[in-house]
Every structure is written in structure tokens, then in C-alpha cells.
UniProtKB/Swiss-Prot annotation:
Lineage of origin: Eukaryota, Metazoa, Chordata, Craniata, Vertebrata
Protein name as catalogued: IQ domain-containing protein N
Chain ranges passing through the membrane: none
Pfam families the UniProt entry points to: IQ
UniProt organism field: Macaca fascicularis
InterPro entries found in the cross-reference section: CellDiv_DevSignal_Domain, IQ_motif_EF-hand-BS, P-loop_NTPase
Keyword Transmembrane helix assigned: no
Subunit structure: Interacts with calmodulin.
GO biological process annotation, one example: spermatid development
Residue ranges constituting the IQ domain according to the UniProt record: 89-118, 907-932, 928-955, 952-979, 1091-1119, 1114-1143
UniProt keyword terms in alphabetical order: Developmental protein, Repeat
Coiled-coil intervals, chain numbering: none
Region (Disordered): 1-56, 431-450, 769-797, 829-848, 1145-1166
Length: 1166
């Protein structure tokens, strides 16, 4: 608004004392008045000199006053004021709208930001929960890996070294249902400080060795302190659940030893403690003793031709086992006072017939005079034991009896006695005599057959920890001491003192009825030309006593120990090698005699991948248990047929080591025609019972004579024909035992009959899966022959056309049909490939063979197997590519049950991950939709609320504006309507016009006319012209046309009105009086102008007052509106978070100037 011109009037006194208002000169006026000097208002009498000038000044002022008043009171000036007010209101409305739009925008942004923050917070909470859930899963996984030992019976409590927890990673438990071994559950035996462990220098060997000489009742392999050799056995068995895995540092294999693969194996510290006999024993041996001493039943007598798989294979740091010195110990009749130079059996009566021990290490290994496959080794031959042809009567129950009951029994828990190569040492293999030495017919080949010397395994001690007296002739009831020992072993509290108890019990009853085995049962072995033949007969009870006598220390807790065996020449004891594997606990029952004619005509050369760790012992102590261990089946040539020596039978460095060795001589008597009635023993299997790795890992190879190790060609898949007694036998692959475990999970421990009838019945229910219809019964239990092997020679040839690389074949150690020869191939690297080809003539182990299966433990282990693929298992594509095909349709092997289970687990994991991802994505989508709905609802609510506030504010503003406009219009209307009042005539007189007269002394409006120039101060010229003269009232009535006219000042269009004039009335006294009265009332134009001036001043003052009053009202209304808006805006800003976004009143500065200018605006009081 433009600042209004402040008119200041000064009062000038005229000479007559009249106050004259004189405004100061205003340059902005259009008429540009001259400047007049201001004079004091109350000026006294002046001198006479100045008197003439004052009237002139007064005259000049009076001449300019009308024009100033006319300008101030002109309609143009008023229009300017109105325009300024309109502009002010327009600006105010614009500011209000802009502020409202900004407020709306800020509210929208705030709502969006709030919604975004809510969404982000929700997402953060979800992500946190997801991370916490993942961490919980990881913790659960770690806990599952740490505590993956399922519930074990009290007798299965494991005592571990405190340093076991510091190993690399937890073992992968094996599913008991599948009976499939894991890939990293072997133990790296770290040598403990023991008086029996001696450095190689003490042994007189230039190179370090991993194998310690075997002594009666001693099992295990000890790593010398200077050796750090990580090994992996072909058939690893789950040891303690706390066993850790480590990477192999060297890959060592030898023909005599089982495959040593460069892969992850389990390491475990085995602490040796001295038992009561003063001989250090390892916890493994103690556990072995406990497991073996469980239900010890005297088994029927029979020749033993398969080494017990309890002895771990010996490991040499070098790939080729050289310098294996053959040390023969003369075997004397089995008597209790017999002493073994390297016997580790504590509290075992010394026996006079030492057993030849072989040490398959780079140190000068003392090897028993069995044909060994050691090449590049100048065998040291110790005096060969006199025992070559021995008829081993079945000794006491193999379970509770240590190896010391007889030389044959002694070899049960440790590795097979392997004689060195005949080509190297020309010494025939020696069979350790059984407790009852029966002279076998001289069907022994001389050791001249360089590599074809028969196994040096005491077949009487075949099944380690098992009462596996082969082909028992008669069932003998186990002694009470044996049963008592079995009961004692079930007590966890006596795990550590069981050795002493067993010793005391076993030494109590020395006499037992003498039992002799028929000549068919006699064990036949190739005899050296020099050593004499020794026969030792011993009754079953004495054998049992001998077993018990030696077992307290050896079998106390099923641990395997290898005591240093001093050679006969030097007498230096060898350091006992601690078995890295945990001995399996087995219970044996009396085995029924097996018909010799039904037995297969093949001798068993058992090569065991490793001793499995049994996690559960059979519930009933008296129930027999079947022991199944992966074994290498080697077909022995018919007697009298020499086998070609294998010179480069050194260890191949390929992980799957295939022992291709024809057995040099059948280990059975000529009358038995190679039938080896194997005593069937059943061992409670937890996860790898079917794959129970016996301790006679590599010695079976040595005992089998010269054998060739081919690492890359699976022996089981090569169908070769061997002639045993002139009959070709097609070697077959036995079906993986873990498949049988699935089918026989609910079986109980039963005694398997070794007869052909029993074997046919036992495996009849599995014939549909194991052996196809075209498979012949005799083919099911035939022994696979090495690749390229012919009866007369041994070749190093590659795989047969049908051969395919298979890893992890599991076969039972003892077949129901007698001694089912089988071959165990090396397991794959880290379990990467576990598919096992099922050849057309595979035989599935019977339900009785696989042993009892704990469903709860199996399920728990199978659940824990879910995490196994993450620790080195093959990828999904690798397993998926192994399609299950029919053996006749494709040469590829059938996928094993374990691989199929892993594939299923991976599939289930993938499906679960997909489902979880889908559920999470769907949940997030639902959250987004719900957030959108919430945001939309909130925005709608805010919009409606703001709209309601806006409507209320608008209503208030509009009401205020309408009131203001109405009041302004009314004021303007009142100002434009100035009624003309006539002077009241005398009483009773009436002014007669057409219809209106002033009667009863009342004055009435004569005319409502308002001229077009009514806005001006001076009267209308028309009205003035029509006004009545003195004595003559108006008599002319002006009739206006119908066309409207618009005022040039107010801009209103109004119709023309009739100006009522005073008509000439009738003559008479009334008229005269009326005219005189009118004449008095109407001022005369000749009156002095003084009155006119006074009236003008009064009117102008009144009008100024009215205008100022209206202005004050308008200002008050504007202030009210502005205050209302400011309060509303401030409250809105305080309610929101936008109070700090900017100034709440952006137009405060201009408003302040406006109010300042308006407050100082006032009208002159004239």
C-alpha cells in the first residue's frame, strides 16, 4: 500500500479572529499549489504593518482549501485506497496459498520419510532375525559337529586324550543305516612316550618305519616320534566322534600294505598306559579288550585262513616298502610259558613258540616268514618258525581271546603275518600255529615261488575281536570265565580295570577238554625248506585260557597295540606302534560247523582297510555278533602251483590302491580243496559296522604272497578268472555292505551258519537286490582276482575292459558260505566318489551279516550327515552324473546307497533352500503390500485432516472477508445516499406534492434522487436548478428516459429517477404561509460564504471520522485473519517435524513493513 499523504492543517486566525485551516503544501497534488509559509495557530495581534498582509494570505488559503478537500475526498483517492487494500489482500491470499502448499508438500515428505523409515526398520529387524537365525544354525551345526556322538551304551563310553579337542575339524559320522564309511574318520596316531617305542636307530634300521612288529595279543601301528605320516586307509571306519581330520603329508602305499592315500584322515592322540603286566597298553587296546572280552564263547575248532581285520595296516613313509627283513621265529608247541619277543600282551603267559613278525616299514622290518610283496628289499630272514603245516584247532572264542592263545590266535588282532617275497628271501610263508597244532598234509609250496607265498595269517585268529575260528568242527560252550569277562566288559565303570579282572579270571581255570580239528581244518602254509615243521596240539579250553591270559592287557578295551618284537638274532624289541584306529568291539557266539564240501575252493587272503571303531556293543552279551569288515579278496592258486614273484609290488601312489596278488598257495589242506570254513561272526555295527575295518590291513596282503598294488584300477570291477583246484572262478564284486545295512537295519545279532544252505537262506531275501537271477551261487562268494592275473603269473597290467574305477567297496569279512574271499578297494579321496559299481554277480550281505542297527542312532547320524557334503563331499553334479544303471546295460557301476542318500540329502537341502527363499520372498512381498496399504491409509488420513483444517481456515477467511465487504458496501451506500430534508413548515401546513406531504409537523423526504455527481461535495447542478425559488416551489417534474446512466465516480449503473419537485399548489393563505416557511428554510444564495465553509468542514470531518473508523475495522479484521493464520501455521509446524525446516512465516518482513506503514496512517481530523 502506498503511504497515504498526511495532511496537516494549521489554524490561521483571520483578522476577525476566525480560525482558518491551512494545509501544508503537497507536491504530489495534481494542482501543485504554491508553498505558503506556516504561521502559528494562535497568533496575537500584529502590528499594523502586517495587518494588510494577513487578509491577503487568508484569502489565498481560502481559495486553495476547496481543491485540497476535493482531492482528499475525491473518488479517485478512495479508489486508490481500495486498490491498495485489494492488492494487500491478494498478496496475503497468495502467501497463504504458498504457505499452505509448502505445508502440504512438507507433510507429504514427512509421511514418505516416516514410511520409508518404518520399512527400513522392519527390514533391519528381519535381517537381524535372519542373521541371528543363521548364526544359530551355524552354532547348531558346530554343536552338532562337536557332539555328533550319538547315544552309546554305557560300555561304549570313550576316554579320550585332552588334546583331541585341539584338532582341526570334527569327524563326519557315518549313517548307521547305510553302513557306509565316511572319508575322514581315520586317526593319525601320534606316538606317545612309551618304553616300547624306540627310534629306528635303536631298531637298527636306516629308514623310519611306521609299523611295529606284531606280538601275541598286540595290535596297532605306532608312529615313531620322528615320523609325521598322515595316512588314509581304503575303508576308513568311524573312530571316536571326537577324532579330528588332518591332511596327509605323504602318500604311501605298498603291496603288502593297504592303500595309503593322500587325503584327509583323522588324527587322534593315543595315550599308552601300562597295564598290570607292566606292558604299556593304549586306550584302543583296552577298548579292544573290553569289546572282545564281552560274550567270549569258545568256538569250534577249525583252520583259520583269513587274517583278522583288526590289525591296522602298517604304513611306511616311502611309497615303496624296502628293506623288509624277514625274521622267522621258530614256532614251538603252544604252551603258556611261551614267550614272544615282541609280544605286547600284558599278563600273557609267555609262549615258547614265537611267531614270525613282519614290520613293513623302511626300518629293517622284522617280517614273519610269509611271502611279502616288498620289492627292492633285501629281506632279512630271521630263523623261520618251524611251523609251516599246522592244523589249527579252533581256539577259544576269538572275541574274548587275545592273539596269544595260539600263534594263529595271536595274529587275529594284529595284521597278518606276511612273509617276505620268496624272490627276495626265498623263504616260504609261515602260518602261525594254532593252539592245537595239527600237521597238515605236505601240500605246501616251497617259498621258492617268489611272490606267491601264501598268507602268513593265522587263520585260527582270523576275525579280530571275533571268535572267528574258521569252520568250527564242533560248537563248544564258552567257559564261565569268558562269559563273566563278557559281562564285566559291559560295565563302564570297569573299563580301565577290566584287564586285571580278566587276567585273574582267565588264569583261574587252566584245564579244558582237548579238542582236535579234523585234518581238513588244518591250516596249510608254505613251509620254508630250512625250518622244521612243528605240531602243537592244544585243547579248546587251553586255547581259551591262553586267549584269556593274554587278553586282559591286549583286549581290555578293544585297543590295538603293536609291541616291539625283537628279532631272534638281535633280540632288540621293536617299538609298539599305536593303532590310530579305534578297535571295534564285537561279541561272538558259537558258530555252527560248516560243511567242508560246501565251502568255496578259494582261500581267503584278507586285506583290511583299517580297524573300525565300534560305537555300540551288542545288547546281549551272549548273543553272537557278526563282524563285517572290508577285506581284499585274493584268490589263491591251487596248491602246488607256484606264483610268480612281483618285483615292483611296491606301493602305488594312487589313492585307490588295488592289491592285485594271486595267493601263492591255498591256505587249506589238500583234502579241504581250498575250502575255508570261515567262522561267521557278527559285530554290532553303528555307522560303519558293515565297513568295519580290521586291524590286519596290509598284512593280509603280505601273507597272501607277492601281490601287486595297482592304485587306479579297481580290483572288484575286474572280472578275472582264477583256477582253484583247476576250476575257473569268476571274481565278483560284492555289493557294498551298507546297502545290506539298509535292508537289515532291524536285524538282531544271530549266529550265521557257514554252510552253503545257511548262506543261501541268509541271503535269499537280498537276492533280488544283491545278485541278479543270472548270477550263480558259486559266483557270489568267489574271490576277485587281480587284473591281468593268470594262474601262473602275475602281471602289472591295467584294468580289465569291464574294470572301472570304484572306490569304497564294502564286503563282509565272513560270508555265510564259509570263507567268502573278497577284495576291498581303496576309498575315494575325501569321500568325493563313493559310488560303487554293482557287478552282475554281486552278493548282498545277509541281514545277519550286517549286524544289528540302532534306528535311533542311525537316524541321528543320518541327520548329522547332512553337513558332510560341506566338508569335502563331491559336488551335486558329480553325484548326479553317477546315474544308476543296470549292470548288464552299462559298464558303469551302480551308485551306492550312501551316494544315493547324499544325493537325496542334497536334493532335500536344495528344495528346502528354495522353499525357504520363496517363503521369505513371499513374506517380504506381503510386508511391502501391507506397508503400502498402511502408507496409503495414513496419507489419506493426513490429507483428509489437512483438507478439513483448510476448509475451516477458508471458511473463517471467507466469513471475515464477506463481513468486511458487506460492511464496506453498506458504508459506501450510506455515504452515497444523502437525503434532502425540507424544513418543517408550520403546524398544520402540508406540503402537497403528488403523493407525499409533510403532515402533522413532520418533515419528510421530498425526493430520493441522487445525482450522478453525488460523490462530489457540491450539490448536483440539476437538483440545484430544480430547487424552488423563494416563494415558488418547484413545479417542473423531470421525467428521465429509460436508459440507465453510470456514475463516473462510483462506477455504479442506476436507472434514472424522477425528481419530485414542489408543484405549484393552489393559491391561498396556506400557500403563502408555506412559501414563506420554505423561503426561511432554504438558505439564500446570498448568505455569506462563511456558513458554507463551516458546513463543508463539518462534513469533511465527519467523513474523515467515518473513513478512519472503517479503516480501523478493516485493519482489525486483517489482523484477526493474519493472527488466526499465523497461529494455525505455527501449531501445524509444531506438530510436525518440519518446524526446523524453515521459517514458519516467510512473509513476516513484508507484513511487518505493511503493518508499520498502516499503523502510522491516519486521517486528518477536519
Amino acid at each position: 500500500m502506498q503511504p497515504a499523504t498526511q495532511l496537516q492543517f494549521t489554524n490561521h486566525l483571520s483578522p476577525n479572529g476566525q480560525c482558518i485551516l491551512q494545509p501544508p503544501p503537497t507536491p504530489s497534488l495534481p494542482d501543485k499549489m504554491e508553498k505558503a509559509p506556516p504561521q502559528p495557530q494562535h497568533e496575537g495581534l500584529k502590528s499594523e504593518e502586517h495587518l494588510p498582509q494577513q487578509p491577503a494570505a487568508a484569502k489565498t488559503v481560502s481559495r486553495h482549501i476547496p481543491r485540497l478537500r476535493a482531492v482528499v475526498e475525491s473518488q479517485a483517492f478512495k479508489n486508490i485506497l481500495v486498490d491498495e487494500m485489494d492488492m494487500m489482500h491478494a498478496r496475503a491470499a497468495t502467501l497463504i496459498q504458498a504457505n499452505w502448499r509448502g505445508y502440504r508438500l512438507r507433510q507429504k515428505l514427512i509421511s514418505q520419510m516416516t514410511a520409508a523409515k518404518a520399512i527400513q526398520e522392519a527390514w533391519r529387524r528381519f535381517n537381524k532375525r535372519h542373521i541371528l537365525h543363521s548364526s544359530k544354525l551355524l552354532v547348531k551345526k558346530v554343536r552338532a559337529e562337536d557332539g555328533n556322538i550319538p547315544y552309546h551304551a554305557p560300555q561304549q563310553v570313550r576316554f579320550q586324550h585332552p588334546e583331541e579337542n585341539c584338532l582341526l575339524s570334527p569327524p563326519v559320522m557315518v549313517n548307521k543305516e547305510t553302513q557306509f564309511p565316511s572319508y575322514d574318520n581315520l586317526v593319525l596316531c601320534r606316538p606317545q612316550s612309551s618304553p616300547l617305542l624306540k627310534p629306528p636307530a635303536a631298531q637298527g634300521t636306516p629308514e623310519p618305519c611306521v609299523q611295529a612288529p606284531h606280538a601275541a595279543g598286540v595290535r596297532g601301528v605306532a608312529f615313531l616320534p620322528h615320523q609325521t605320516v598322515t595316512i588314509r586307509f581304503p575303508c576308513p571306519v568311524s573312530l571316536d566322534a571326537k577324532c579330528q581330520s588332518c591332511l596327509l603329508t605323504r602318500t604311501i602305499r605298498s603291496t603288502c600294505l593297504v592303500h595309503i592315500e593322500g587325503d584327509s584322515v583323522k588324527t587322534k592322540r593315543v595315550t599308552a598306559r601300562t597295564n598290570k603286566a607292566g606292558v604299556p597298553e593304549t586306550p584302543l587296546s583296552r577298548r579292544y579288550d573290553k569289546a572282545v572280552m564281552g560274550p567270549s564263547r569258545a568256538q569250534t575248532q577249525g583252520p583259520v585262513e583269513a587274517e583278522t581285520p583288526k590289525a591296522p595296516f602298517q604304513i611306511c613313509p616311502g611309497p615303496v616298502i624296502t628293506k623288509t627283513l624277514l625274521q622267522t621265529y621258530p614256532v614251538v608247541s603252544m604252551t603258556l610259558p611261551q614267550t614272544y619277543s615282541a609280544s605286547t600282551t600284558t599278563t600273557t603267559p609267555h609262549k615258547t613258540s614265537p611267531v614270525p613278525k613282519i614290520t613293513i616299514t623302511k626300518t629293517p622290518v622284522q617280517m614273519y616268514p610269509g611271502p611279502t610283496v616288498m620289492t627292492k628289499t633285501a629281506p632279512h630272514t630271521c630263523p623261520m618258525p618251524t611251523m609251516t603245516k599246522i592244523q589249527v584247532h579252533s581256539t577259544a572264542s576269538r572275541t574274548g581271546t587275545p592273539r596269544q592263545t595260539c600263534r594263529a590266535t595271536i595274529t587275529a588282532k594284529h595284521q597278518p603275518q606276511v612273509s617276505l617275497l620268496a624272490s627276495i628271501m626265498k623263504s616260504p610263508p609261515q602260518v602261525c600255529p594254532g593252539p592245537a597244532m595239527a600237521k597238515t598234509p605236505p601240500q605246501t609250496h616251497p617259498v621258492a615261488t617268489p611272490a606267491k607265498s601264501p598268507l602268513q595269517t593265522c587263520l585260527a585268529a582270523t576275525t579280530s575281536n571275533t571268535s572267528s575260528q574258521m569252520s568250527p568242527v564242533g560248537l563248544t560252550k564258552p567257559s564261565r570265565q569268558t562269559r563273566l569277562a563278557a559281562m564285566i566288559t559291559k560295565t563302564p565303570a570297569q573299563l580301565r580295570s577290566v584287564a586285571t579282572i580278566l587276567k585273574t579270571l582267565c588264569l583261574a581255570s587252566p584245564t579244558v577238554a582237548n579238542v582236535k580239528a579234523p585234518p581238513q581244518v588244518a591250516v596249510r602254509g608254505s613251509i620254508h625248506d630250512n625250518p622244521p615243521k612243528a605240531k602243537a596240539t592244544m585243547n579248546m579250553k587251553q586255547a581259551a585260557e591262553a586267549v584269556k591270559a593274554s587278553s586282559p592287557s591286549c583286549l581290555a578295551e578293544g585297543k590295538i597295540r603293536c609291541l616291539a618284537q625283537s628279532r631272534l638274532g638281535t633280540g632288540a624289541p621293536r617299538a609298539p606302534a599305536k593303532l590310530p584306529l579305534e578297535a571295534e568291539k564285537i561279541k561272538t557266539g558259537p558258530q555252527k560247523p560248516v560243511k567242508a564240501d560246501m565251502a568255496l575252493k578259494t582261500s581267503v587272503a584278507v586285506e583290511v582297510a583299517g580297524a573300525p571303531s565300534w560305537t555300540k556293543v551288542a545288547e546281549e552279551g551272549d548273543k553272537p555278533s557278526h563282524l563285517y569288515v572290508p577285506v581284499d579278496v585274493a584268490v589263491t592258486l591251487p596248491r602246488g602251483q607256484p606264483a610268480a614273484p612281483l618285483t615292483n609290488a611296491s606301493s602305488q601312489r594312487h589313492p585307490p590302491c588295488l592289491s592285485q596278488r594271486p595267493l601263492a598257495t591255498p591256505l587249506t589242506k589238500a583234502s579241504s580243496q581250498g575250502h575255508l570254513p570261515i567262522e561267521l561272526t557278527k559285530t554290532p555295527s553303528l555307522a560303519h559296522l558293515v565297513t568295519c575295518l580290521s586291524k590286519m590291513h596290509s598284512q593280509a596282503h603280505l601273507a597272501t604272497g607277492a601281490m601287486k598294488v595297482q592304485s587306479q584300477v579297481p580290483l572288484a570291477t575286474c572280472l578275472t578268472k582264477t583256477q582253484s583246484r583247476g576250476q575257473p572262478i569268476i571274481t565278483k564284486r560284492l555289493i557294498p555292505a551298507h546297502q545290506a545295512a539298509d535292508l537289515s537295519s532291524n536285524t538282531h545279532s544271530q549266529v550265521l551258519l557257514t554252510g552253503s544252505k545257511v548262506s543261501n537262506q541268509a541271503c535269499q531275501h537280498l537276492s533280488g537286490l544283491s545278485a541278479p537271477p543270472w548270477a550263480k551261487p558259486e559266483d557270489r562268494w568267489t574271490q576277485p582276482k587281480p587284473h591281468g592275473h593268470v594262474p601262473g603269473k602275475t602281471t602289472q597290467g591295467g584294468p580289465c575292459p569291464a574294470a572301472c574305477e570304484v572306490q569304497g567297496t564294502l564286503v563282509p569279512l565272513m560270508a555265510p558260505t564259509g570263507h567268502s574271499t573278497c577284495h576291498v578297494e581303496s576309498w575315494g579321496d575325501s569321500g568325493a566318489t563313493r559310488a560303487q559299481p554293482s557287478m552282475p554277480s554281486q552278493v548282498v550281505p545277509c541281514q545277519e551279516d550286517t549286524g544289528p542297527v540302532d534306528a535311533g542312532v542311525a537316524s541321528g547320524q543320518s541327520w548329522k550327515r547332512v553337513w558332510e557334503p560341506a566338508r569335502g563331499a563331491a559336488s551335486w553334479e558329480t553325484r548326479r552324473n553317477k546315474a544308476v544303471v543296470h549292470p548288464r546295460q552299462s559298464g558303469e557301476p551302480m551308485v551306492s546307497m550312501q551316494a544315493a542318500e547324499e544325493i537325496r540329502i542334497l536334493a532335500v537341502t536344495t528344495i528346502q533352500a528354495g522353499v525357504r527363499g520363496y517363503l521369505v520372498r513371499r513374506r517380504i512381498r506381503v510386508w511391502h503390500r501391507r506397508a503400502t496399504v498402511i502408507q496409503a491409509t495414513w496419507r489419506g488420513y493426513r490429507m483428509r485432516r489437512n483438507l478439513a483444517h483448510l476448509c475451516r481456515a477458508t471458511t473463517i477467511i471467507q466469513a471475515a472477508w464477506r463481513g468486511y465487504s458487506t460492511r464496506r458496501d453498506q458504508a459506501r451506500h450510506r455515504q452515497m445516499l444523502h437525503p434532502v430534508t425540507w424544513v418543517e413548515l408550520g403546524g398544520g401546513a402540508r406540503v402537497m406534492s403528488d403523493r407525499s406531504w409533510v403532515q402533522d409537523g413532520r418533515a419528510r423526504t421530498v425526493s430520493d434522487h441522487r445525482c450522478f455527481q453525488s460523490c462530489q461535495a457540491k450539490p448536483c447542478s440539476v437538483c440545484h436548478s430544480l430547487s424552488s425559488r423563494i416563494g415558488s416551489p418547484p413545479s417542473v417534474v423531470m421525467l428521465v428516459g429509460s436508459s440507465p446512466r453510470t456514475c463516473h465516480t462510483c462506477g455504479r449503473t442506476q436507472p434514472t429517477r424522477v425528481v419530485q419537485g414542489m408543484g405549484r399548489g393552489a393559491g391561498g393563505p396556506g400557500a403563502v404561509s408555506r412559501a414563506s416557511a420554505y423561503q426561511r428554510a432554504v438558505p439564500s444564495p446570498r448568505q455569506p460564504r462563511r456558513r458554507d465553509k463551516a458546513a463543508t468542514a463539518i462534513q469533511s470531518a465527519w467523513r474523515g471520522f467515518k473513513i478512519r473508523q472503517q479503516m480501523r475495522q478493516q485493519q482489525m479484521a486483517a489482523k484477526m485473519v493474519q493472527a488466526t493464520w499465523r497461529g494455525h501455521h505455527t501449531r501445524s509446524c509444531l506438530k510436525s517435524t518440519e518446524a526446523l525446516l524453515g521459517p514458519a512465516d516467510p512473509w513476516s518482513s513484508s507484513q511487518h513493513m505493511h503493518w508499520a506503514s498502516s499503523q502510522h496512517t491516519h486521517w486528518p481530523g477536519i
